[in-house]
């Protein structure tokens, strides 16, 4: 089933100049990039994107990190795009859970600085795409 997902290359991925490497892996996986933009993330967008984590102990540091520098926001499309990208990204903890061959397993340094975000469900993808690409 063809679906869409939102992917963010987080500030650590942009700062470390890994955009090309990450996009190459996305394209090699067979996912199409239907929208892509380098963006500075404002507080309102960050809060809306991470609303499910509000009230958790790490919420403030999450907002601080995602607004610390530009991100690459992209919409990917393809068969089972959500699961396909999440498999490509690897576990959220790059050191302990992400396996070699994944973006985080090969390139990630620590849990908060784990390079990429990918939508985790069709509902999240729809909400996140509407937030980051309102006209799409």
Swiss-Prot record:
Assigned GO CC terms: cytoplasm
EC category name: transferase
**Which keywords fit this entry according to its UniProt record?**
ATP-binding, Cytoplasm, Kinase, Magnesium, Metal-binding, Nucleotide metabolism, Nucleotide-binding, Phosphoprotein, Transferase
**Example GO molecular function term?**
ATP binding
One GO term of the biological process aspect: CTP biosynthetic process
Q: Where in the cell is it found?
A: Cytoplasm
Chief place where the protein resides: cytoplasm
What EC number(s) does its UniProt record assign? Answer: 2.7.4.6
Question: What cofactor does this chain's UniProt record say it requires?
Answer: Mg(2+)
Q: Where is the active site?
A: 117
- Report which reactions are catalysed by this protein: a 2'-deoxyribonucleoside 5'-diphosphate + ATP = a 2'-deoxyribonucleoside 5'-triphosphate + ADP; a ribonucleoside 5'-diphosphate + ATP = a ribonucleoside 5'-triphosphate + ADP
InterPro entries attached to this UniProt entry: NDK-like_dom, NDK-like_dom_sf, Nucleoside_diP_kinase, Nucleoside_diP_kinase_AS
Q: Which of this chain's residues are annotated to bind ATP?
A: 10, 58, 86, 92, 104, 114
Which CDD domains does this UniProt record tie to the protein?
NDPk_I
Q: How does it assemble?
A: Homotetramer.
The family annotation for this protein states: Belongs to the NDK family.
- Main function: Major role in the synthesis of nucleoside triphosphates other than ATP. The ATP gamma phosphate is transferred to the NDP beta phosphate via a ping-pong mechanism, using a phosphorylated active-site intermediate.
Name the record gives this protein: Nucleoside diphosphate kinase
Identify the species of origin: Mycolicibacterium gilvum (strain PYR-GCK) (Mycobacterium gilvum (strain PYR-GCK))
